């Protein structure tokens, strides 16, 4: 319920449904004035009127300037115009200019027709030009007032105005306003016409007939000087002679044109379109009558044709100006306010529509990121086909690369390719869900314990189907870490600081265990004062970057994806959930004998899973959950005691290149282990070379990446931990737990964000 007051400031009204109908409908609703229960004064009641004098169901506006303006401004102007017209038309106080003429000019020697014999005399013209439009306007206003008064709540009816204790309804005010402007326009048109006629003194076609010039009184003959300037008229009727000197412009034409145009504008603005022919009929009738009035002055030799045409232009121009600017095109006084409200309403609708869309998207995207446990246990949305994945909506968002796919988008590691420093290409923004997490070890243990307990109840078997050899797309491994908190947008878009990626430049892969000084180097930036986050990338459709020349390979990948996508429909859980559940069933998840609080997670993308009974020294990343001095430490075993502190690629111990990290080989198996976990850290980075069998006496959470030998057909699994021995010290602020997509063509890029070239890894 919206409360609104009248323009006078004292009235109040109730408008129901204003929010649903919009500004225009609410403004057009009539405000009902209610009577107080005690018979007291009603809202909006004027001081000078009693309750009985106030019409019921009407909105009354109080005006202080209505009567003073009418009495002291409008009436004097109208009266002065009438008085001036009287002296110009009915008296000889103002005489026209005496202009010259030629001797025996036949264009000025037309017969003179008496006023009583004229088709439209001047007095008749004044009567018709005044009475016709005035009566038409008053009748039209009366009919309009009656029709609007019978409507419910008086919609479209102007409010009454109380001025000086008198109540003026809309009919009276509109009639007086329109008729008064019409009268003023007639007087103004007549005055302008008379002034022009007196100033020019252009002769009428009958001038020589009524003038009767005496050519003998001239000192020279007409043959010697044909143009005569002197007054040689010998006619007895001076009034007729003076009238013959006022031909330009035609007064009949100006008055008729003004009346016709003025009343036509009234019809166009007032009459509705319910009757398609009534409005044109009335308009054409008045226009034709005005034209006839002007043409009769030509046929009866009262004016020249040019005088009539100019009179039409003058009269029509005056009527057009007064109709548009004096009476506002005959529209209600508050119509301009309605038009302004329409503009405001359109702007309001445009502002509200995006808000509704944003609120809907917020509601759909905020369900999965309410808290940490909700993210960890969030069910993976089922993507039934590639068509469903290509829809960008609140559930699924496809991230396309900003640059076209080309050679600069692909990085190939091979022992046959030379080293090349390719400029980095800005990667597409991924949908990441980030939440704030506590730094204490108790909170981390609690989260991991809850996660394990909830997944132990899931007794679902992991179905892994071996893809066809030669058709699995290559995986692109990219590492990113963020040292600043991110926020999740409406669609789940990742909004945060600019993406900073850890780029690994390709180098020659050695064939032996000797370290290469030119290996790829890694530098990570840690911004001070940043908050710690648990960063869990959301499962999205990754882009497969291919060269324009290798479109056939991409077609093969899509074909293979369509064949194997049906096999993954039954897996509604995230990939990491399924791996943990399967590992629990097979007894893979085991604790260290010296560590009762730690846990080991094994994740492989091959057909079979390999238990962790045989520990490999180079494949374990240890995170100290309860360090000394409250400083989480990352311990990465390394077999080298010295080095440059950079990533170094080493050949496998058995001398086989089966585990070489090569992404551009289509014959590889597409499944690879991508499980990586970063730990929190705020102190100095520490690095130690320890054996994999030696465990820390504190609680350790270990994520192991175990490579498994390929099947009989030669499919191999890419491994990170067994293919290289990395020595890494970093100050991590984010724990990344990537999830796996169901589509085999999807690639998971695990990347560190927020790198810094100033702080590198040391020995």
Curated annotation (Swiss-Prot):
Membrane-traversing stretches: 67-87, 119-139, 178-198, 247-267, 276-296, 308-328
Post-translation changes: O-glycosylated. Probably at Ser-346.
Membrane topology: Multi-pass membrane protein
Annotated region described as Disordered, given as residue ranges: 33-54, 458-529, 669-698, 739-763
Molecular function as annotated in GO: phosphatidate phosphatase activity
Tissue distribution of the protein: Expressed by glutamatergic neurons (at protein level).
Localisation per UniProt entry: Postsynaptic density membrane
Effect of residue 299 to S: Found in a patient with infantile epileptic spasms also carrying a SCN1A variant; uncertain significance
Residue ranges with Polar residues bias: 740-749
GO biological process, one term: phospholipid metabolic process
Glycoprotein listed as a keyword: yes
This protein's name: Phospholipid phosphatase-related protein type 4
